Amino acid sequence: MLKSIQRNGKKQKNGSKDKEPTPPKEQPLVNGNHDMNGHASDSVAPTEQQNGETKKKSDSEVMEIIQDAGFTVQIMSPGVEPLSIQVSSMELVQEIHQLLMDREDTCHRTCFSLQLDGVTLDNFAELKNVEGLKEGSVIKVVEEPYTMREARIHVRHVRDLLKSMDPADAYNGVDCSSLTFLHTITAGDILEKKKGRSDSVDCTPPEYIMPGAKERPLLPLQPGVGKKGPQPLKVLTTSAWNPPPGPRKLHGDLMYLYVVTMEDKRFHISACPRGFYINQSTDDTFEPRPDNPSYLCHSLIDLLSQISPTFRRCFAQMQKKRTQRHPFERVATPYQVYTWSAPTLDHTIDAIRAEDTFSSKLGYEEHIPGQTRDWNEELQTTRELPRETLPERLLRERAIFKVHSDFVTAATRGAMAVIDGNVMAINPGEDAKMQMFIWNNIFFSLGFDVRDHYKELGGDAAAFVAPRNDLHGVRVYSAVDVEGLYTLGTVVIDYRGYRVTAQSIIPGILEREQEQSVVYGSIDFGKTVLSHEKYLELLNNAGKHLKIYPHSVLNDDEEEIELCSSVECKGIIGNDGRHYILDLLRTFPPDVNFLKLDEELSKDCKAFGFPIEHKHKLSCLRQELLEAFIESRYLLFIKHAAFQLQQLNTNKRQQKQDTPKEETKAIEPAAKEDSANNNKEEPAAKKGEPKAATGGVPKVETEEAKKLMESLLSSDEKNESREVVKRACEAVGSLKDYEFDIRFNPDVYSPGIQHVDNPNAANSIKKQKQLVKDAAEFLVKHQIPSFVHDCLDHTAAPMDGSTLTETLHSRGINVRYLGKVANLLAKIKQLEYLHTIAVSELIIRAAKHIFVTYMQNTEMMSMAAAISHFLNCFLTTATSVSSESDVLTKSGSSGKQQRKQNKRTAAGGGKGGKSSFQCTQDNNEWQLLTSKSLWAQIQQELKSYWDYDLLPAGTVDSADPVVTHNHLQKISLLRAFCLKTGVQILLREYNFETKNKPTFNENDIVNVFPVVKHINPRASDAYNFYTTGQTKIQQGYFKDGYDLISEALNLLNNVYGAMHPENAQCLRMLARLSYIMGDPQEALAIQQRAVLMSERVNGIDHPYTIAEYAPLALYCFANSQISTALKLLYRARYLATIVCGDNHPDIALLDSNISLILHAVGEYELSLRFLEHALALNIKYYGEKSLKVAVSYHLVARTQSCMGDFRSALNNEKETYAIYKQQLGEAHEKTQESSECLRHLTQQAVVLQKKMNDIYSNGKLTTGLPPIHIQPPSMGSVLDMLNAINGIIFVQISSKEIANLKNEIEKRQKEGGAAGESSVAQANQEEVDRLLTETMAKTAAGIPFEEQDNYELPLPAATTGDEASSSSKANPVASSS
C-alpha cells in the first residue's frame, strides 16, 4: 500500500531518504473504533520472545528487511504510454496489479494478467521468486476474458471509481471511509503552496472563534459541505433482466446492466467474456442481441465514454481530482470511524449497495474461495504462526491484525443485522431476550440475564456489564500470548439500546451440551468445579504475568479442586484439539469499595463514603492498578528489609557508634513511616512515570535500600537474613514467608465459593482478602489524589470525557470513581476546567444508562421521533413531543392501530422470529418523558451509581440550572451524547434557547450507529523501537532517535498498513524531530500526514486531532505560509471550543500562537484580544507568579507598545519584571532583559508625553525631541517566541562559554594523558550536559534572544522547566506509542 502511495508521486518522508520501507503485503479492507478503553495500549507484560537476545538481533534484522533491494521494471499496458515503477523483491505480483487498478490511466482495467516473456505471473508470488525478473524487465498487461465473477468485480470497481469523490460512505459509516477536511481548510496541499508574503495575508478570524464569543455554530465543523462534484451518469445498475436465461448463457451472456446517461439516453448492456456491449433490450422487451453499433469494449468505462460525451468529460475530470487527493484521504481505515453529525445526503439508485445490504455476505465475501470465512480458524491459525525472528513476527502480527480488523467489521455488521431483525435466531421459540444467533460463522448473544444466570450478581445489570469485563479478560490473555492457550475472537457492540456480544465459534461446541464440553472451571458458579492438568499449566504461565494467584476450592462433593483463574473461567477443548478459555469476566480481583460485605473497610475508604453498593457485583479492579500497587509494595518490601538489616548490623557493631548512625539516616525515616501498611506520601507507581519508579522516596534512599538488600542476600548469617526477609514479607502482605509474592485470588469474595484454607499460613484466605482490600484502598488513598496532584501542572490536560477516561484508566482508576474524582476537583480552583469535563462525563454516562432502557421500549417506527424527544428533554425545556410525532401516532386509522396491536400479540411478549426487537410495550410510553422527569432520573442515577450529588434535590427541572452551575455548554453535551450512544444528527444550527418550538425534530435524527469495543492487537517490535527512540531523544541524541522512530514507523506500516492511530503518533514525533534538527520543510510534510491520518482514524474533532493542528501551524509559519498557519490555528480553536469551551489551558496556548502570528502581520488590536484572554487563562491555571504569566504579560506589553499605548505597556512589563525578579533573581538574564525593556518603554512614554504636552501648549511640535520608535517585530523574533511557547527551545551557548568548554576539555585531556578517544568523548558529553543545564534557565521563559553571534544547540522541551512543558501534546518526550 505504501509503495503505491509513493509511486503516485509522493515522496516518502518517514524513513531514511535513501531507502524505501517494505510495504505491507495485505491491505486491511475493513473498519471500527479505538480499543475498548479508548487508549491504544494492550501491553500486559513483555512476552517471552522479546528477551535480550532477540533484541540484539533485531537491529540487523530490521535493516535487512527495510533496506531490501529495490529495482525498476517497465509496465506495458494497451493504449497507454509505458510506465516505469520501483518495486521491492519482497512485494507480491498482486501489488503491481493493485497499483495499476489505482492509477489514473489504467484504473478502468480489472480483468487482466501480467506476463513476463509470454509467461503469466502468479498473483500471489513474491517478485524475488519470479524467474527472469530483473532490473529493466518489461511486464506486459494482457486483457483476459471475463467470467461471471470477474464481470461483477469489474462493475463494482467502476461503481467505486464513479463514487470515489462522494463523501456519502464516510457519513454512512461504510467501507472504512471517514472524513477529512484539512485540504478544504488549507485550500489544497500545503506542500504545493508558494510562500506567502505577510502583506498579502487575509487573517481576519471569524467572529465565532474570538475570545468571549458565546455563539458555537455547528456548520463550520464540516467546511465545504454541499459542493457537488462532476456527475458522469444518472444511473448505473444491474438490469432486472438478470440472470441470463439458458439459451443466452450458451451465447456467452454473463450479466445485464442498465444505464441512464446525463443526456437522458437509456441503454441496456450485456457483459460477455470479450467485454461489454449495447444490446437491443428495452424496459419492456427482452432482446439481448447486440445493437447496431454495439460498441464492444473490454472495459465498461471505454463503452460508456463512447455512448456519452458528458461521461467522457466528467470521468476525466473526476479521475484528475481523485489522483490529486492525498493518498491518506483515500486509503481505507482499519476500523470504521463514525461521525456524529451529517448533512442531508441525496439517496441515489445503487443496485450494488442494495445487493450488499440484503445478501448475508460481507461485501468482499464473494471474492474469497469457500464463501463464508471460518473466523475462529483464521484467528487461531494466525496466532500459531512462528515468531522467532523479526520477519516472522512482522508476518504474524500483520496477519493477526488483518484478520482481527476483518472480524470486527463482520461482527459489527452482523450485530446490526441481528438487532434490525434481519437474522433468524437459532432458538426462535424462546423469549426475545433469550435468543441467540449465528451469522457468517459468528455467534451473537444479547446482554440480558438469560435463565437467571446472573441472578445472584445483579440480574440484567450484571449481564450488561459481563461482556465488557469478558473483553478485558480476552485483551490481557491475548497480550500475554501464552503458546497453546486460545481465546475467542470477541467484539462487544452497543446498538439501538442493546448490547450484543459477537464471538468466534469453538469447533464442535454446537454439537454437544455445554456441560459435556467444559473440562476446566465451573458452569454453575462454583457448585460443580472441574480442573485439568494442561489448563493448570497454561493458566499458571499466564497468571504469572497477570498476577493471578493459584488457589484451591471445594466442590459440592467436598473435593479439593485446584484453579489458576476465577471459577467462572471455563476451559473447553475444541474438536480441533486447541485449549480454549472463555467467560473471563472475573479475570481481575473484585473491587470491595463497591461490594456490600460483612467485613469492615479501612478508615480512609469509609471517609470517602465507601462501600457503595452497585447494581451488580461484577466490579473489578483494573490491571494498571494492580501493577502500580505491586510495584509500590515491592519498594516498601525492599526498604523494610534494608532497614531491618541496618538494625541487625548496628546491634552487631555497638562499639562503632558513628558509622551506623550515618548509614541509617538515609532509610530509617522512610522505612518507619512506611511500616504501616500504606503510606500517605506514596504516590502512583505506574511504569514509565518517574515518580512511580521510586515510590515517592528520594532516589538516594531507594538506591541505598537496594544496595543493602544485595548485601543481605550475600550475608553469611543465613538464619538472620531469613528472619529479616520474613518480617519484610509480613509487613507488605506477601503470600510467601521468605519471598516477595503479591498476587490476587479473583474468587476471594465470590459468593457460594468454598475455599481450601490454612488460617496460619502466609497465604491464608484472610491475607488474600486483605490484599484485595489493600489494593482497593491504594486506589482511593494514592492513585486518585496523585492523579489530581499531577493534573495541577496541566502537561496532559484532558479536553473531553474520552480523554479524561483514558487518563484515569492509565492510572488504574475505574470510571465508577469519577463522582469521587469530581468532588476532589471541585475543591481546586486551578482545575475548574477538569471539574467541568468530569461533571459533563458523569451526566452523559447517566443519560446513556437511561437512554438504553428508553430505546428498548420504543418501536422502530417511532425511533427518530423518540430520540429527538429525548434530546429535547435532555438539553432544553420539553414537556411534550413535537407535533409531527403526534400526527404520526394519532393519525393512523383504527385498522392501522389494530394491525400494530395484532403484531404485538403475534410476537407473544417478544417470542418468535424477526419482530423480536420491535418494542412489545405500548409505543406511546416514550412520549410521557419530560425534562423534569428525565433530569430527576439522571440525578437518581448519578447518586446510585457514582454517589454524586449534582444539585440539591428539587432544584433541577431542566438542563439550564446544571449548565449554568457547572459552566457546561450544551453543544459539548450534545456532541458527547451522540458519540456515546451512536446517534447521528443533522448538520445544522440548533437554537437551545427557543421556547415556543422544540429544538430537535424527528428529521434531525439522521442515523444510529453501533458503538464498538474490541481488543487492539499490538505491533510489539515497532513499540520497542519507538520507546528506544524516545530514550535516545531524552538523552539528547536526536539523529539516533529520529532513525529509530523512522524504523518504528516502517514496522508499523508493515503491521497495520498505512492508517492507524499509532502511525499518526509516530509521524508527529518525526515531524517534531525534523523541526528541532533544523528542517522545517520536512517537518511540514510529515506533520501534514499526521493531521490527515488523525482526522481519518480518530475523528475530525477528536482532541488528538486538535492537538495535531498547532504543530502544523507552527511549521507552516516557519515555512513562511502565514495565512495557512492562521487558518489552521483558527480551525484548532474552533474545534476546541466545540469540544470543551474556551476555558481550558490548551486554549491559552492556541490563543498565544494566534496572537503572535497576528502580531507578526501587524493586526495588533486582534492580537491583543487573544493575548489578554491567554493571559487571563494562564493566571487562572498557573498562578499569578508563574513564568508562563510573565511571558504573557511581556507579549501584551510588546503588542501595546506597537499600538503606541506605552502607559499600559509599561504597567504590563512591570508585572513581567516583578515575576522574573521573584522567580529567577535580579541578576538573571531574563530579569535584566525585562529591566532593559522597561527602560526603553519609559523613555518612549516620556517622549510621547512631551510631544503631547507640546501640542497642547503651543499647538505645534518643538523641534529637537527624539522620534518615537515603534518597531514592528521581525519574523525571526516571532518564530523564536512561537518555538518557546510551544515547548521547542533552542539553547543558546555564547562564544565565551564555548571557549570555556574547550579549555576545560583540553585541561582534562592533559590530566587524563593517553586515556584514549572514548574518555575524551565522554568528558566532552559530560561538559556539554553541564553547560546545557546551566544555560537552560536563561531560556526558560522564552523571550526572544538579542541578536548576537551565538552557537545554537537544539534541545527538546522535555528537559526544561515551566515553559517547555507548556504543551504536552507537542512535547516529543511526553508521548508514548
Curated annotation (Swiss-Prot):
<dbReference type="InterPro" id="IPR027523">
    <property type="entry name" value="CLU_prot"/>
</dbReference>
<feature type="region of interest" description="Disordered">
    <location>
        <begin position="886"/>
        <end position="917"/>
    </location>
</feature>
<feature type="region of interest" description="Disordered">
    <location>
        <begin position="651"/>
        <end position="700"/>
    </location>
</feature>
<feature type="repeat" description="TPR 4">
    <location>
        <begin position="1183"/>
        <end position="1216"/>
    </location>
</feature>
<dbReference type="InterPro" id="IPR028275">
    <property type="entry name" value="CLU_N"/>
</dbReference>
<feature type="repeat" description="TPR 2">
    <location>
        <begin position="1022"/>
        <end position="1055"/>
    </location>
</feature>
<dbReference type="GO" id="GO:0007005">
    <property type="term" value="P:mitochondrion organization"/>
</dbReference>
<dbReference type="Pfam" id="PF13374">
    <property type="entry name" value="TPR_10"/>
</dbReference>
<protein>
    <recommendedName>
        <fullName>Clustered mitochondria protein homolog</fullName>
    </recommendedName>
</protein>
<dbReference type="Pfam" id="PF12807">
    <property type="entry name" value="eIF3_p135"/>
</dbReference>
<feature type="repeat" description="TPR 1">
    <location>
        <begin position="519"/>
        <end position="552"/>
    </location>
</feature>
<dbReference type="InterPro" id="IPR007967">
    <property type="entry name" value="GSKIP_dom"/>
</dbReference>
<feature type="compositionally biased region" description="Polar residues">
    <location>
        <begin position="886"/>
        <end position="896"/>
    </location>
</feature>
<feature type="region of interest" description="Disordered">
    <location>
        <begin position="1310"/>
        <end position="1377"/>
    </location>
</feature>
<dbReference type="GO" id="GO:0048312">
    <property type="term" value="P:intracellular distribution of mitochondria"/>
</dbReference>
<comment type="function">
    <text>mRNA-binding protein involved in proper cytoplasmic distribution of mitochondria.</text>
</comment>
<dbReference type="InterPro" id="IPR025697">
    <property type="entry name" value="CLU_dom"/>
</dbReference>
<dbReference type="GO" id="GO:0003729">
    <property type="term" value="F:mRNA binding"/>
</dbReference>
<keyword id="KW-0677">Repeat</keyword>
<keyword id="KW-0802">TPR repeat</keyword>
<keyword id="KW-0963">Cytoplasm</keyword>
<feature type="domain" description="Clu">
    <location>
        <begin position="353"/>
        <end position="595"/>
    </location>
</feature>
<dbReference type="Pfam" id="PF13236">
    <property type="entry name" value="CLU"/>
</dbReference>
<dbReference type="InterPro" id="IPR011990">
    <property type="entry name" value="TPR-like_helical_dom_sf"/>
</dbReference>
<dbReference type="InterPro" id="IPR023231">
    <property type="entry name" value="GSKIP_dom_sf"/>
</dbReference>
<feature type="compositionally biased region" description="Low complexity">
    <location>
        <begin position="1364"/>
        <end position="1377"/>
    </location>
</feature>
<dbReference type="InterPro" id="IPR033646">
    <property type="entry name" value="CLU-central"/>
</dbReference>
<dbReference type="Pfam" id="PF15044">
    <property type="entry name" value="CLU_N"/>
</dbReference>
<feature type="compositionally biased region" description="Basic and acidic residues">
    <location>
        <begin position="655"/>
        <end position="690"/>
    </location>
</feature>
<dbReference type="Pfam" id="PF13424">
    <property type="entry name" value="TPR_12"/>
</dbReference>
<feature type="region of interest" description="Disordered">
    <location>
        <begin position="1"/>
        <end position="61"/>
    </location>
</feature>
<comment type="similarity">
    <text>Belongs to the CLU family.</text>
</comment>
<feature type="repeat" description="TPR 3">
    <location>
        <begin position="1148"/>
        <end position="1181"/>
    </location>
</feature>
<dbReference type="Pfam" id="PF05303">
    <property type="entry name" value="GSKIP_dom"/>
</dbReference>
<dbReference type="GO" id="GO:0005737">
    <property type="term" value="C:cytoplasm"/>
</dbReference>
